[in-house]
Amino acid sequence: MGCKTSKMCCPRLRKKKRQKAHQEGLTSKELNDLNAKSQEPNELLQKIKKYEQETRDILQKHQAEKAALADTHKADVEARTLELQAQAQKDRDADIAKLLLEQAATIKVEMEEKLAELQKSNEQEKASLTETHQQLIDSLQERVDELKTQLASFQEKMKRVEESVLSQDYRRHIQDHGSPGQFWEQEIQSLHFVIEMKSELIREQDKRLRSHKSTMERNLVLEERSRTLQQENEALKVQTQKQGAVTVRLSEELLSTQATLEKQIHLREKLEREKEQNLYRAVNGDIPQQFSLQSNAQELPVMVL
């Protein structure tokens, strides 16, 4: 009985053991599954954190690259702007220098023409004065010749007085009636001489008066001509001074126009920059827009024109 019973119990025990072992196996498997399932969220969290960190790193790197590119682009734009402004200033200076040279050439031509006119006038005046001087010399020479002629005439008069009709009549009277005395004879001769000399002197003075009248008329003409030349010289001097004043005024107006033009250019450049900044803010908020150098290169020449 006991053996039979023990034989019957052994399979049951083994079955129980198998069931127990199976249950224990299931339990350990479930535990392992649960452990595995409990570990998966941690791994996911770690992966998410890692992904977020990588994302932040990428974003930071992208922001750094973006800032570097923006700085580089800004520096390039500023350099290009300065280069274009320098070129524009150089062109403006060249144009102004060309204009000044043209005006200087024009003024030089005008001054040379005025100088030529003055030289011509001076030459004419010099020739006129030379002619006047020569005329005066000739007049003096004529006067000397006239005095020589007068001396010869006086000598001739003396001779004629001695041979005059009065003298001859007086000598015949003396021969016919005798001499009235030495004293009266000398007085009468002196009187005859004085009468003849006075008559000749009256004729000479009349001739001299006519000559002086002609000389005075010629001197009046020369004085009038001299006054006319002097007035012309004064007018030329005044005109030259006016030309100098006009030249100074034109230079001052040119400098003022240049300063006004530069102010307008600076104001226009400032307005263009403000316009671009407002456009950047309107498109991208506070972040400056990255625009190409080509577009700025096309806009900047418009600003400096």
Swiss-Prot record:
Coiled coil: 42-167, 216-278
Keyword DNA damage carried by entry: no
Cross-referenced InterPro entries: MTUS1/CCDC69
GO biological process: spindle midzone assembly
Localization per record: Cytoplasm, Cytoskeleton, Spindle; Midbody
Residues with a covalently attached lipid (N-myristoyl glycine): G2
Functional description taken from the UniProt entry: May act as a scaffold to regulate the recruitment and assembly of spindle midzone components.
Protein name per its UniProtKB record: Coiled-coil domain-containing protein 69
Species in which this protein is naturally found: Xenopus tropicalis
